[in-house]
Amino acid sequence: MLQQLLSNAFTMVLIILVINIVYVSFSTMRLILTMKGRRYAAAFAGTIEMLIYVIGLSIVLDNLDQIQNVIAYALGYGMGIIVGMKIEEKLALGYTTVNVITKELDVDLPRQLREKGYGVTSWVAGGLEGDRTALQILTPRKYELQLYETIKTLDSKAFIISYEPKSIHGGFWVKAVKKRRIKE
C-alpha cells in the first residue's frame, strides 16, 4: 500500500511537503528549546526531528528524477520555518523585559500597572525636554502583547523597548512573576 501511495505523483509531492513542514518545525523548536536551556525537551525534539528527516530525505533521494519532489522539499522547508515560529509564538517560552519611557513625569502609570499584576520598577529619568518616568517591567512572554496594549491604553505616547533577558537571578521579580497571574 505504501508503495502504491508513493507511485502517485501528487501524493508523493504532498507527503514530501508535509514531512518537511513537520521536520523543520521540530528543528525550529529544538533550536529555540536549546537556546532557552531546556535540554531534555530539546533532545526529545531533536530525536523526533532526525527520525522525520531520515524518512523524508530517503523519499526525496529515491525520487530525485522528478523536479516537483525537489520543489516540494524546498517549499516544505520554508513553510516549516513559518509553522515552527508560529508554534513558538503560541508557546511563548520564557520572559521579556519591557522598558517604558513616558512623555510626562507620570507617577500613576507604575501604580496602574502594578494593580494589573505586573512587577514594575520605576525611576525619574532625564530626557532632552525634561524629566520622564522610566519603567522596567518583567513579564512572561505570553503576556507581552497584553502588556503593550495596557501601556498604550494608559499612555498612548509611551516609548516602549523590549528584550529577552538571558538569565534572571533573585529579587522580587523571579518569585512574584512566576506566581502572579496578570489581570486583563
UniProtKB/Swiss-Prot annotation:
Cross-referenced Pfam families: DUF2179, DUF5698
Keyword tags: Cell membrane, Membrane, Transmembrane, Transmembrane helix
Cellular compartment(s): Cell membrane
Annotated signal sequence range: none
InterPro entries xref list: DUF2179 (IPR019264), DUF5698 (IPR044035), UPF0316 (IPR022930)
A GO CC term attached to the entry: plasma membrane
Source domain of life: Bacteria
Entry similarity comment: Belongs to the UPF0316 family.
Protein name: UPF0316 protein BPUM_0594
